């Protein structure tokens, strides 16, 4: 691994999304030099499924030798960012490095992506990066060797990286375009670069996309922390670069990359937006025991009807609370004009819903006409009446079927 040199001693680093994952790893690497770290993230209270808060991260940073300032920040909120910037300047005297790490991901096609999810990704990835940079730049300009580092991919305009998740790609490439523009705008004053991993990195987001078995195909977050550290050592003339973690570490003399592997010797999963094919990523994940929570298949015509619209709405209102209280996976075999198979997973991770077979075995299988399905989820047909009249057949856990009926009543006001 890359050794610390003390280069960042006394520097102030403002990191968004630093309560866990890659953001926290970068913070801890800098802390070993004695850096000041502003932890700008949303998680103030413990999350039921995700590790860490801004306060636990602060404690780890202090223990590693740095100084920490935990700030509750949603990067979509200009006031919260501005307050955090002001607190950082007041406590540490300025800002030397900004890391735009906060990000949201949803790998669904255009018809399957509710605007709520699209707005979330654009708001956090693109707008959040632009806004945080804008508010930090006046202070960065006063630093001796200022850097902005966006955790975003090279601008690979091959359509294969758009076709299955256009909204996510636009949002993520927006971060990369901030690099392209700001690097030129502030050339000679601030180094503005992007960093992206060559392979998948084990994070909560990766576990969500590939399931628990995907971890062994990943590298640890420390490789990204070391790569970021290598970038921060560069002068401001090193700017406008789209850096791949492994490439810059090779230039730093690192030869043994097995130390970064979650399971040394296991085949590694290439990351998105590089030279591979999306279909190959899915095959790689499946071949080594992971369960991809996304698809590379072309959009199905069935995804353009009223059933699809209903599922778009359902996706937009799935919440951790629903998953926690329901704990069931539902499969819907629909006949009629909009025939097809759909699923609703209110058991695993953050919950999911979509066209096709469920990612895991269904606890309940419901069969009915597509028109009746739309009526039922739209509140115009009671599930009990549909079942009693023979319009709905149910196989599996009846208790979970009843839970779904209760949930539909709660959903009715939101549909």
Swiss-Prot record:
Transmembrane segments: none annotated. InterPro entries: HSDL2 (IPR051935), NAD(P)-bd_dom_sf (IPR036291), SCP2_sterol-bd_dom (IPR003033), SCP2_sterol-bd_dom_sf (IPR036527), SDR_fam (IPR002347). One of its GO terms (cellular component) is peroxisome. It is found in: Peroxisome; Mitochondrion. The active site is at 168 (proton acceptor). GO terms for molecular function: oxidoreductase activity. NADP(+) binds at residues 17-23, 42, 74, 172. Keywords: Mitochondrion, NADP, Oxidoreductase, Peroxisome. This is Hydroxysteroid dehydrogenase-like protein 2.
